Every structure is written in C-alpha cells, then in structure tokens.
Amino acid sequence: MRLMLNEPVKEIMTKDVVTVTPDTPVSKALGIMEENGFHHLIVVDKKDGKEEYYLISMRDLLLASSTDEEVRSLMYKAHCVHEDTPFLDAVCEMLDSGQRAAPIVNNVGKMVGIITDYDIMARAAKSKIMKDTKVTKIMTRNVITINENDSIGKARALMRDNNIGRLVVVDDEGNPVGMVTEVDILKKVFKPKKKMTAGEFKGEKVPRMGQPVRLIMNTPLITVDVDASAADAARVMQEYDIRGVPVVKGKSLRGIVTRLDIIKYIADLKKGAMIEIELHGMLDPEFKDLAERIIATEVKKMVKHAGKIHWIKITIKKERDKGGVPYYRITTYVKTPNKLYVGEGRPKASLPNKLEAEGEDIAYVSEHERWEFIDVLKESLESVLRQLEADYDKYHPKHAGKVVKGQFPEEFNPEEFKKEE
C-alpha cells in the first residue's frame, strides 16, 4: 500500500477517454456528458497530422446561445500532464491551471488518458493521509445557505455574489434539507426558459426564477458526519458523483467540504504547508515567541530529511523539585508517512545547585527558567532530527551526510519502512 501519494499519474488516470471534435454540436456534447455523468469533455483537434487537446465544461455548454452551436466556440486550450508525473505534482498542476480535468500525454505528446477531480476523489478516499485527516480541518465552516421557500432567483444571486457553485437549502428551523447547484438552475430553469417565447411557462403565474428553490433542490440531502475523515468525504463525493457535501452533527449543519477543498489540501501537502503542530501543556507567554521560532527552524530541517511530515505534537510538562524550583520535561512526536519518531528533552543539571553556587536573586531564577525551557525544547526537537538523519543515511548510502532538497532520491524504497496500516 502506497502512503506518499507519489505514484505516477498514469496509475490513477482513466484510460478510456471519450472525446469530441471541434465541429460537434453543443446538443450532442451535452448528451454525451449527461449519459456518462461527465462534467468535462476533451476536444481533439487534428491539424497537419498532429492532435491538439482542448476542454469544454458542462456549465459553458449550458450557457451556449444555441444547442446547434459548435463546441469550437466554447472550448479552451488544455494544460496536459505527462503520464510519469507524480500524483501530487499532477494535482498541483491541475490546480495552478484552473482545470478540473487534464489530458495525460506520453513522451511524444500523444494522449493516453485523462485525470479528473473524480479520479482524485477516488485516490483520496484510499489515502492513509486523508484517512488521518478530520473533515473539520478542511471544511468551510461559515456555510452560505438559502431557505427552501426563497426564490430560485435569490439562489442564483447568492451564488454569483459569493462566487460559489452550490448552496445548502435549509428549512425554517435552519436544518439542512437539500442542495441546489448552479448547474441545477441552468439545466432545470434557464435552458427550458430560453425555449419559451414568453418569460413564464404556460399555465404558470409565477416566473420560474421566482419560484421556491425547493422545487429544484436535490433531496434527500447527502451528508457526512462531523467526525468523518477527509477520505470519507472524498468517497461520498465519488460514490454519489457530487461536488460538495455538507458536514453535519445530528441535524445541525456544521460546514461544507467540496472536491476543490480536498484538491487544495492535497496540493498543500505537496507544498509542505500543512504540517500540523500541536502544543500540549503549559507554555508560558514569555517563552512563546522564541519557542515558535525555534520550532519553525527545526521543523524545516526535519522536512529536508523526512520529505513529508503528517503532524508534530509537542507535550510540555512543568514540574518542581523538592526545593520548589521549576523544571521542564518536553516530548516531541513527529509522524511521517512511514514512522512515528519520539524525542525527549530533560534538564541537564540540577537547577537548585546552580542557583546555590551562583547565589543569584529571584530575577536570575526567572531568566534561568526561561533558558532551561529553551534548552530542553531544543534537545527534544534535535533528538527527533538526529533520528531522521540516521534513517535518511541508512536508506541513502550514496548520500550519507548530505541532504537532497525537496524529496527522496529515486532509489529510496518506502516499502522497506515499517508500514502503519
């Protein structure tokens, strides 16, 4: 079982790619999307014996002026990803390009597959990292909602004003009862309305955009519990082919997580921006700034040797000896994809003896306590760093004593480490 999300994207991609050509009518492209549950299609344009790849989205097709229009007027040049690109890098490339899908190409630029946000959800659902990540960590907490009796027009305005593609629909008690998306409005309201010569459907006294949103919302509402993992949320979105899922506790709405949230989180893992550091125990305010700087410095050193760190937990115990003089015991836990490292820091000498020998006053006690804490903290962190360096040299004999910045060399085999299933 791979833990590092570093397999080549060709192992994740969908190999059987459905494509269209630039002269395909919008109506036919929409039919292909609805039949297969696609949100995007690749357009293959052959020029001078070579293929160029473009993308079209369902949203763009639904906004077309005519269903007889050719897709060439709506397609855009696709950013392609090489088949040997590591999965994490491929996710970053997709995110940077603004695409939710990307053609996968070989060494000669020939398309061999496609990766979509659906494929990313499938991989995330199996990821040990994502299983260890609470959905509450990546969800949006301040959810924009709409009452089930509010108009469809209001729902559209809320989406436009907040630059979002979906709204959770709530009842009068504020409990979530459904979901409405921009595509729902386009498919169920906008497109049918465009076919009419008047602004209302025959026999209706209220225009469609003025009707209650409950008429077009998706129900029953699919949710995940507040205790679920990010992997659980990814699995639900993949299984039900939805792009966002509310997070609930009982009947209470606590947040919402989308495919984009998970994609961004995965990209942040690659960029090293998601190392969670937890401090347990009493950290005196006068130590805080210096302690944080020391932790940040040592963590950077750890990342160079570990490649990836899931989380760091530091426990601080402040105790007193028989003479009432405070001292610290600090333990640092560092979780990598393959191992849990533990480092301990303890006072190196008896503080009372030092004070008695020096004969200093209480101000000295306070200052000495500060540096005693810092010394113990550094010893705890450096203990873990020494273990990481030892493992790095053990599995990188060619690079003993050196650091390869960014990631492990190719000869590193994560299977040699003890796995934590």
Curated annotation (Swiss-Prot):
The residue range of the signal peptide is none
Q: Which UniProt keywords apply?
A: CBS domain, Repeat
PROSITE patterns found in the cross-reference section: CBS
InterPro entries in alphabetical order: CBS_dom, CBS_dom_sf, Diverse_CBS-Domain, UCP036983_2CBS_MJ1404
Q: Does the keyword Cell membrane apply?
A: no
Domain of life assignment: Archaea
Q: Where is the CBS domain?
A: 13-74, 74-133, 139-195, 217-274
Q: Which Pfam families match?
A: CBS
Q: What is this protein called?
A: Uncharacterized protein MJ1404
Query: Which species does this protein come from?
Result: Methanocaldococcus jannaschii (strain ATCC 43067 / DSM 2661 / JAL-1 / JCM 10045 / NBRC 100440)
- Lineage of origin: Archaea, Methanobacteriati, Methanobacteriota, Methanomada group, Methanococci
